A protein has these predicted regions:
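Acidic, glycine-rich flexible loop/linker segments
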Residues: 74-77, 84-175
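Conserved, well-structured core domains of diverse proteins
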Residues: 1-75, 80-81
């Protein structure tokens, strides 16, 4: 969709940014590092800068930088494809964070929602979830320690809540 395209357009813009790519080239040449290590070092610097910004929207762009970096490093290492091997239907993915690439690669025939520890309404993973019509709640703090494999979880993306092991009455309300 249009929003999905905008997210990846932002990623392409980053790849075209001479400051970002130029720093990588300089790091390889000046510090005699391999490409993967140079990408990681430059990414760490850019992420630190973006995460320290006052504007929440700009702070959330640090996640985009991490996503682009992860994909570059994965390609340099000759690895590709999805980070998830989900085999069961009605799976709720619970993670510290999901990148836009991770979100786009979720198998929608198996994943019925996702929850993350970090993120906000303007994070690209949240935007991707809305675009793909995947119920999601981001920025839950410590959801990865609260949900165990096999728990029944209701993902209420409208209210921004996750209900872990709800009563039968609550399940009936959400059906």
């Amino acid at each position: 969709g249009e929003h999905e395209a905008a997210v990846f357009e932002a990623h392409l813009t980053l790849l075209d940014d001479p400051e970002f790519t130029g720093q990588m080239e300089m790091t390889i040449e000046n510090d005699s590092l391999n490409a993967m290590k140079a990408v990681q070092n430059v990414t760490d610097t850019f992420v630190m800068i973006f995460e320290s910004m006052d504007d929440a929207y700009m702070r959330e762009r640090a996640a985009d930088i991490k996503d682009v970096s992860k994909r570059i490093i994965s390609n340099l290492a000759g690895k590709g494809g999805s980070a998830f091997a989900i085999t069961e239907e009605n799976t709720v993915v619970v993670a510290h964070d999901l990148t836009p690439s991770d979100t786009a690669q979720l198998d929608r025939s198996k994943v019925c929602g996702f929850l993350t520890n970090i993120g906000g309404r303007t994070s690209h993973s949240a935007i991707m979830a809305r675009t793909l019509e995947i119920p999601a709640v981001v920025g839950l703090g410590d959801i990865t320690t609260s949900v165990k494999n096999g728990d029944l979880v209701i993902v209420d993306g409208i209210e921004g809540v996750a209900i872990i092991n709800p009563s039968e009455e609550v399940v009936a309300e959400y059906k």
